[in-house]
C-alpha cells in the first residue's frame, strides 16, 4: 500500500479524485466514435461536428482525439486535441455544436477527421419538478394544460461511492457501476471503468440505485437494480 489519501467526488458531469490539493478527472468514457468531421464559420467560436448516430445530448461532455483539422479554419490541431468540450446544441442526430475559446478565421463547410470520446452522462445539475403527462390525477384540469402538481420530481445527477480496499466503487444513480484502482501504477492517469483489471464490472447490472460493499463479507451489493442483468427495463 502506498498510503496515499484519495477523496472521490462525484458531480453531475464528472467523477474526480482530490489528491494533494489537485483535482484529477477519472470520469468513465463511453465507446469512442471515429471518423467525425468538423465545420467552422468565420468570426464565430461555434464549431459543428458531424458524426452519424452520435447519441449525444445538450450538456454532455466529449473529449476530442486524433484531430486532423481541414485547412482554412485558423485553428490548430492542438486547440482540440485531448480537450474537453460541452455539447451546446444538437441540431440533428448526426450533428452537434461545441464552442471554442476563440473565433474561427475562416469558413469550412465540413472536413478533417477526429474521434470523439463521450463522457458517461450522469444527470441534471439540480432537482426539478416534472409537469406534464402522467402527473396528478387522470382527468384533472383541461386537456393540454400543464399540471401543477409537485409530487413528481426529476432527480439531479447522483453517484453512489464506496470502496473495496484501495478500489473505488462508483455507481451512477440508476446507471452503471465503475471501478478505479487507487493502488495501480500511475493511478491518477487512469479512468474509472467497467473493465478495470481484476475489478471488472462489465457483467454487473447496468441500472442500480445504489451500490455498497458489505463490511463483513466484502461482497458488492446492488440495490434497486435489474431483475434481468443488462436489461434496464427490469430495474425494480
Feature locations, PLM:
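Beta-hairpin (beta-strand-turn-beta-strand) motif
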Residues: 12, 122-124, 132, 173-174, ...
Amino acid at each position: 500500500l502506498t498510503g496515499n489519501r484519495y477523496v472521490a467526488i462525484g458531480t453531475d458531469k464528472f467523477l474526480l479524485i482530490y489528491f494533494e490539493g489537485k483535482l484529477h478527472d477519472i470520469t468513465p468514457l463511453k465507446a469512442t466514435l471515429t471518423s467525425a468531421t468538423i465545420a467552422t464559420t468565420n468570426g464565430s467560436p461555434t464549431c459543428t461536428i458531424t458524426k452519424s448516430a452520435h447519441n449525444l445530448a445538450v450538456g454532455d461532455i466529449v473529449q476530442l482525439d486524433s484531430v486532423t483539422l481541414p485547412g482554412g479554419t485558423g485553428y490548430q490541431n492542438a486547440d482540440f486535441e485531448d480537450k474537453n468540450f460541452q455539447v451546446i446544441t444538437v441540431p440533428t442526430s448526426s450533428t452537434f455544436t461545441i464552442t471554442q475559446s476563440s473565433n474561427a478565421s475562416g469558413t469550412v463547410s465540413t472536413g478533417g477527421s477526429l474521434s470523439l470520446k463521450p463522457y458517461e452522462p450522469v444527470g441534471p445539475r439540480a432537482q426539478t419538478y416534472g409537469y406534464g403527462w402522467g402527473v396528478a390525477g387522470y382527468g384533472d384540469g383541461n386537456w393540454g394544460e400543464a399540471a401543477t402538481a409537485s409530487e413528481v420530481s426529476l432527480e439531479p445527477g447522483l453517484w453512489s461511492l464506496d470502496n473495496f480496499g484501495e478500489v473505488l466503487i462508483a455507481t451512477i444513480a440508476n446507471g452503471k457501476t465503475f471501478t478505479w484502482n487507487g493502488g495501480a501504477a500511475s493511478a491518477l492517469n487512469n479512468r474509472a471503468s467497467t473493465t478495470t483489471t481484476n475489478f471488472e464490472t462489465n457483467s454487473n447490472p447496468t441500472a442500480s440505485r445504489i451500490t455498497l460493499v458489505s463490511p463483513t463479507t466484502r461482497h458488492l451489493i446492488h440495490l434497486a437494480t435489474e431483475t434481468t442483468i443488462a436489461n434496464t427495463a427490469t430495474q425494480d
